[in-house]
Amino acid sequence: MAETPLVEFDNLHVTFPTSGEHVQAVRGVSYNIMPGETVGVVGESGSGKSVTAMSLLRLNEMMGAYIPQGHIHFNSRDHGRIDLSQAESSVVQDIRGKEISMIFQEPMTCLNPVLSIRTQLTEPLFQHQNMEPEAAEEKIVGLLNRVRIPDPRGKLNQYPHHLSGGMRQRVMIAMALACEPALLIADEPTTALDVTIQAQILDLIKDLQEEFGMSVMFITHDMAVIAEMADRVVVMYHGEIVEQGPVDQIFHDPQHPYTKKLINAVPRIGSMTGKAAPEKFPAVA
């Protein structure tokens, strides 16, 4: 018997009303995310990859967007198989942060600057699991330890501005995992970090995925990250899917010209020689 997808986008369309017209940001998107699988969604800015992801949690509605056509089926632990595009707001609110969590590319703008780390990490536990404060604190200390934050208990009374960018991203990951979600959406989670910290965060996400057994929807414009993280790849361009398939197939036998350009855009050591290489600046005396 075939395994049921955790998430199934079926001919999804997302439209944003603007002055005088309606802009179709996503058009006819269809793909699945299986339990325990990492699906990499890749494309340039404006391709519709983040809009598709935010449709899962109905976050686009805050900006006036609506879904005129299509479905988003989700295998919920508590609500059964439901269509998130048509579910009651209360159901989506219950799933948000509990069964589907999201981490973003700039944690400083996503963490509340006036709330302590303790307050922000315990909120989903109070809301979704009705935990007592003492039990919630013990759980978040354990989570901070799992995301490799040194002296986790000592960080609880600190605020986001006390932490480095890499530490803030680890706090975001801990918050996203607090209720042990079935799906983690990672929307460009390493873009604002330096290269060394990027590698650490990617390794951390992979380790935590294996530990929690969750699926990951990894959104990026970086094909090198996709090659490292994804089992399958969905390539988006101008709100549509132009190609999708297993990661090895996409990298070794890409069919669409846009996919080929994305792969060729990945820098390779020694790939630029002669006239193709950029001019070197003169040495400083």
Task: Show which residues each predicted segment covers.
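ABC ATPase NBD coupling module
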Residues: 78-101, 119, 127, 249-254
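Short, glycine/charged-rich "phosphate-handling" switch motifs in NTP-dependent
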Residues: 232, 244
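Short catalytic/signature loops enriched in Gly
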Residues: 3-5, 22, 81, 150-154, ...
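Conserved ABC ATPase "signature" region
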Residues: 73-77, 134-154, 263-264
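A short, proline-enriched helix->beta-strand linker immediately N-terminal to the Walker B motif
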Residues: 178-182
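A short, surface-exposed alpha-helical micro-motif characterized by mixed small hydrophobic
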Residues: 226-228
